[in-house]
Regions:
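Disordered, acidic Ser/Thr/Pro-rich linker "stalks" and the adjacent N-terminal cap
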Residues: 1-81, 90-114, 171-177
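Hydrophobic beta-strand segments within beta-rich accessory/binding domains
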Residues: 85-89, 154
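Trp- and acidic/polar-enriched beta-sheet ligand-binding modules for extracellular glycan
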Residues: 67-71, 93-177
């Protein structure tokens, strides 16, 4: 809320402003989403991490961990072993919260849905990368010696307060960035 009181000689009237509170209490009002028993039909399905829509466009486009899962993880896999030298992981850092200007800044230091601590695991469950204090949207992991595996799993160990949300996991034989 506020009030605009311009100088009297410029021809603009005094008026009150009302600005709604952003994400009041961190809650989405009047909305409950439950995980479907059939995750293939869930709007937050694991398959979303293979999409290249790394923001909510016509749907969530993210895998969201079940808050009841004590060991949440999402896996991308292939029929045959792949040689991977780079992995790009795209986390939810609140793309749907508009920032009218970069001068406005963000009202929180850490976005609740962003994954804070995670591991990448190969097809035998070995940790091939670990990040312990992530704040970033895009995590680029480069291996000097390529990893050969039939799958890469992202294991979420902690977030900044809300269930983990992941927009993408993309693995490359040759680095793309």
């Amino acid at each position: 809320t506020g009030r605009q009181e311009p100088e009297t000689d410029i021809g603009v009237e005094v008026f009150d402003l009302w600005t709604p509170e952003r994400r009041p209490g961190g809650q989405l009002l009047a909305c409950t989403v439950e995980t479907a028993d059939d995750t293939d039909r869930s709007p937050f399905a694991p398959e979303n991490v293979t999409s290249f829509d790394h923001r909510p466009v016509l749907g969530p486009n993210a895998w969201v961990a079940d808050p009841r899962d004590p060991d949440p993880r999402v896996t991308v896999s292939w029929d045959a072993p792949q040689s991977i030298s780079q992995c790009l992981v795209f986390f939810d850092t609140d793309f749907d919260n508009a920032m009218e200007t970069v001068l406005l800044g963000h009202e929180v230091n850490a976005v609740p849905h962003c994954v804070r601590h995670y591991q990448l695991l190969d097809d035998e469950g070995r940790v091939i990368h670990e990040e312990t204090d992530n704040h970033s949207t895009i995590n680029r992991v480069d291996w000097k010696i390529p990893v050969t595996t039939k799958s890469v799993s992202l294991r979420v160990l902690s977030t900044w307060g809300a269930p983990a949300a992941v927009f993408g996991i993309h693995c490359y034989e040759t680095p793309v960035v």
